[in-house]
Regions:
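C-terminal charged capping/lid subdomain of soluble metabolic enzymes
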Residues: 112-197
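Active-site segments that bind and position negatively charged phosphate/pyrophosphate groups
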Residues: 9-129
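Conserved anion/nucleotide-ligand pocket segment
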Residues: 1-8
Length: 197
């Protein structure tokens, strides 16, 4: 999602250069690998076994994501992660948990259509990653706190400006709440139970 946004905006990567064909190919292969092998790899990890699926996910999460971040670029999801880190309640969550919620938030900011949004939402939900503010331990978060997270996400030192449109701190705060509201509506309409992380 982030590398696609960087490409659309013709923004620089983390190396201060334009994306390379290889960087985009790595980002696409990383996403493909995550979608194809994550559920198998989680089951393998729980069973304490190393299988090709598990190894593929390790490669995607280390080598491909590292090369992809350098050559493909980061944008909204990681900036949102950084914004969330100013909220003490999120400190015990992993980097990946905050980036997962950041990805959904970036898609909200982009105005992704329901099909595109649901592709990532259902994947993130199925892995038990955060899809609500409560999952981030932010069930009682104030509008001011979300606005402060938005300010941190939009700081000049971060990567929000690599999106192909302008984003304000208020946009981020509203999108963080929109992800939460969408999840609750989705779970209610599908009669699903969602356990807090």
């Amino acid at each position: 999602v982030e590398a696609q946004a960087v490409a659309q905006a013709y923004s620089d990567t983390m190396l201060g250069e334009k994306q390379t064909l290889v960087g985009n190919a790595i980002a696409q292969k990383c996403e493909e690998t995550l979608f194809n092998y994550s559920h198998l790899a989680v089951a393998d990890a729980e069973a304490h076994v190393v299988t090709p699926a598990f190894s593929n996910i390790v490669e995607a999460n280390t080598l491909m994501s590292g090369l992809g971040f350098e050559s493909g670029g980061l944008s909204g999801a990681h900036a949102i992660h950084d914004g969330l880190t100013i909220l003490e309640e999120t400190h015990d969550l992993t980097h990946g948990e905050k980036v997962a919620y950041g990805t959904l938030t970036q898609l909200m900011l982009e105005g992704a259509d329901q099909e595109r949004y649901n592709k990532y939402f259902q994947f993130i939900l199925s892995l038990g990653l955060p899809t609500t503010l409560a999952d981030l331990h932010l069930e009682n978060v104030t509008d001011e706190e979300l606005l402060n997270a938005g300010k941190a996400a939009c700081s000049e030192q971060d990567t929000m400006d690599r999106l192909p449109f302008k984003v304000t701190p208020d946009d981020v705060a509203q999108a963080l709440r929109a992800v939460d509201a969408y999840t609750k509506q989705y779970l209610n309409s599908h009669h699903c139970h969602h356990s807090q992380m």
